[in-house]
Amino acid sequence: MSPGKLTLSRGHKLTIINSKRYIFSAAFAALTALAAPTAATAAVEQSQCGEVTITQMNWDSAAIVTAVSKFLMEQGYGCDVTAVPSDTTPAITSLSENNEPDIVTELWVNSTGDVYKKLKADGNIVELTSVLDPGGVEGWWLPTYLVEAHPELATIEGVMANPELVGGMFNNCPDGWGCRIVNDNMIRAFNLEESGIKVFNHGSGQTLATSMAAAYQSEEPWFGYYWGPTTPMGKFAMTSIDLGEYDKDIHQANQNADTPNPKASSFPAAPIVTVVTKDFMKANPEIAELMSNVTFKTSTMSQLLSWKDANNASSEEAAVYFLKNNQDAWSGWINEAATEKLSALLK
């Protein structure tokens, strides 16, 4: 054992993790108890709101959105909420074929195709809000400490003029990812390799994330693609370099591997929304209003994901953490009656 370093056995590690989970689970139970109405009041509220179905998409940020929304609907509005496991394509297909679930949240519009456009145009669904602001973010990033030490690196021109300052390497997406095609075209458009920056194509998302973490923890250069909301973007202070103006036509062309003469364009924010069915909107205007207010900064969600990862927490436990530490944010989402019911949490 090295001096000053404590080595834990696997059993001790599991004990600590399980202890954390017990604490977080207890906190969730306590939070629910604080907000819970009396049995008689709850019965009246349930009859007023009734049953609500909401997607539980199979990625962490969406699960947190659902957990927060479910808690507020149940404890503030007396709803009986069922979280329906789903993904983008199954959710949009179910809306089209079955007019359910009632609420679909963290829907990445760019992945829904023409089905979403038709549902919206036909008035079958109502788009309530951008649940993540400004949406899904993509870019080419440097550690903020590197840009602060060398401000000229804030632009792609500055990076290409100083390849040694960024480690002489660009960390690219794995093969098969959509961002790989865009990045490859951007690399050609900028003549990046001619500036002395080699391109390293990662074999997986895990190695891409690990490369960032290793560089950051050693305060070494790192230059590459990443996106948010994600755990690494919440854990590490990163700066998106200026790639020039966004051009819709150029960006769309860059999504095709056979684009003959690619040009440069920055990445747009991907729209990520919450929608409800038209029928639900009419029957439950107060819940629709609530869900139109439930929105997170993309950076805040990345920080929540980082906290969840560091504490080996569940999505429900991350929701508790958010609710306990961000009252100023979510207290503005709920109506007066819900504020009264949840008053114990707002003290």
Language model features: what each stretch is:
Residues 50, 61, 188-195, 202-219, ...:
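An extracytoplasmic/periplasmic, membrane-proximal ligand-sensing/linker region
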Residues 69-77, 163-198:
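Ligand-binding cleft/hinge of the Venus flytrap
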Residues 46-61, 79-84, 167-171, 291:
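Short, well-ordered beta-strand elements
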Residues 41-54, 161-167, 330-333, 347:
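Immediate post-signal peptide segment of exported/extracytoplasmic ligand-binding proteins
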Residues 232-295:
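C-terminal lobe and pocket-closing loops
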Residues 93-95, 101-105, 179-256:
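Ligand-binding pocket segment of bilobal, Venus flytrap-like solute-binding proteins
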Residues 138-148, 271-283, 304-307:
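A bilobed periplasmic-binding-protein/Venus flytrap-type ligand-binding module shared by bacterial periplasmic
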Residues 124-174:
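A conserved helix-loop-strand patch within extracytoplasmic ligand-binding domains
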